[in-house]
């Protein structure tokens, strides 16, 4: 046991000599050793104390140095695997990943013309913001995506394909004193020669199919202020649910995509047709 803990090989005789030199009585045969310390050694209370005495007399500097070993291998979560697959898919489609701040301006949803009564205005407000531009937690990623696209356009970047995976935050509408709802979201932004509604749709389809989402439907949407009314669609998939009358198919909305409305694009300084999805 002593040799195993210390990682060394000391004979029983050597250990006995160490203990006896400290005026301890040793009994037992073979691997069993019973050690009785003198009454003055009140600090010797357990097996580990005896092992420490052997290490001290043997010489701490002689003990081998080893890296601690763990029994359990670290594993990556399913959520992380999904995000990594989404990243790999978008990069394979020629998109660059961007990262933007979670603290944003409430004017962002105004700029993309979100309805006044929309849940996307249920902000988590910062108590001590550095300024209005960082006074709330974001509920959507699209404003930040359009800002990045606008900066690239102002620097004469001919084409952009970008995506972001990030958290969004929303006040608990049932009880504002409770912790906010935090969700993962993804935004995509394209502009440039050859880009149109259908290239974005193809990228969205490829992404969702890679993530194992089948039975996709793109439902025309004319009332979403961010997008051109004739070039916008809600992204949905069919899921099977079991109701009182047995299995039922139900459409589950996953997101929205389309050509950004010219008025919205102008606010971000984008002077060409651009396309976004979230």
What are these regions (language model features)?
Residues 1-278:
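Extended beta-strand-rich architecture
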């Amino acid at each position: 046991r002593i040799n195993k803990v210390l990682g060394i090989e000391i004979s029983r005789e050597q250990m006995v000599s160490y203990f006896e030199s400290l005026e301890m009585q040793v009994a037992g045969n073979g691997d069993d050793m019973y050690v009785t310390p003198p009454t003055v050694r009140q600090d010797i209370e357990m097996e580990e104390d005896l092992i420490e005495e052997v290490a001290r007399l043997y010489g701490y500097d002689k003990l081998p140095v080893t890296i601690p070993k763990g029994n359990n291998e670290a594993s990556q979560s399913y959520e992380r695997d999904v995000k990594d697959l989404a990243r790999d898919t978008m990069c394979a489609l020629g998109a660059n990943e961007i990262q933007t701040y979670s603290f944003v301006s409430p004017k962002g949803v105004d700029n993309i013309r979100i309805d006044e009564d929309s849940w996307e205005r249920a902000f988590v407000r910062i108590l001590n913001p550095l300024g209005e531009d960082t006074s709330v937690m974001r509920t959507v990623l699209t404003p930040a995506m359009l800002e990045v696209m606008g900066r690239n356009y102002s620097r004469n970047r001919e084409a952009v394909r970008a995506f972001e995976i990030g958290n969004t935050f929303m006040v608990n509408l049932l009880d504002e004193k409770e912790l906010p709802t935090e969700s993962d979201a993804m935004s995509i932004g394209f502009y440039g020669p050859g880009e149109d509604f259908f290239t974005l749709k193809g990228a969205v389809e490829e992404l969702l199919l890679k993530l194992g989402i089948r039975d996709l439907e793109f439902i025309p949407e004319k009332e979403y202020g961010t997008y051109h009314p004739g070039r916008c669609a809600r992204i949905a998939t069919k899921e099977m649910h079991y109701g009182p009358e047995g299995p039922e198919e139900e459409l589950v909305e996953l997101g929205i995509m389309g050509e950004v409305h010219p008025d919205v694009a102008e606010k971000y300084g984008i002077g060409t047709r651009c396309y976004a999805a979230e």
